[in-house]
Regions:
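Short, active-site-adjacent cap segments at secondary-structure transitions
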Residues: 44-47, 83-85
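Short, glycine-rich nucleotide/cofactor-binding loops
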Residues: 5-18, 46-52
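A glycine-rich helix N-cap at a beta->alpha junction
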Residues: 53-81
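Short internal beta-strands
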Residues: 24, 35-40, 74-79
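C-terminal structural segments of small proteins and small subunits
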Residues: 85-116
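Histidine-anchored nucleotide/phosphate-binding helix
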Residues: 17-32, 37
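Short beta-strand segments
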Residues: 6-8, 38-40, 79, 116-118
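Short glycine-enriched, charge-decorated loop/helix-capping segments at active-site entrances
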Residues: 50-55, 92-94
Length: 119
């Protein structure tokens, strides 16, 4: 099965990012494909390399970057949501790219299921 994910909450303010990352890894481990993760609203904070969590905490940005590197998952950050929050190409972590809502629509068309994480 081919999945597309949308994450609409920040990494340290809501469980959505943690749950989405765990879902993506579990799906891949079961032989499914996660074709794209679209970060929308406060979810764009998952993509900034400026995040510096304490050493004893999860580093969501690095986790997502590793998912891209290991499984070639397309990590797309909504351009409008990113710009509203001061996130530009210069501060994106490795593996992320900025694009428009058309990428979410495209993922919804190509994927068998689109799963949303966040309120």
């Amino acid at each position: 099965m081919k999945f597309a994910l949308m994450v609409s909450e920040g990494p340290y303010t809501h469980q959505a990012s943690d749950t989405a990352w765990n879902f993506a890894n579990a799906a891949i481990a079961k032989g499914h494909e996660v074709m794209r993760v679209f970060f929308y609203h406060d979810g764009v904070y998952n993509a900034t390399r400026l995040t510096e969590p304490p050493q004893d905490d999860r580093h969501f940005v690095n986790r997502w970057s590793a998912l891209k590197e290991q499984h070639n998952v397309d990590l797309v950050v909504c351009v409008a949501a990113a710009l509203r929050r001061g996130i530009k190409d210069e501060v994106l972590a490795p593996g992320f790219r900025i694009s428009g809502l058309g990428q979410l629509v495209d993922a919804g068309i190509k994927a068998d299921r689109t799963v949303t994480f966040g309120d």
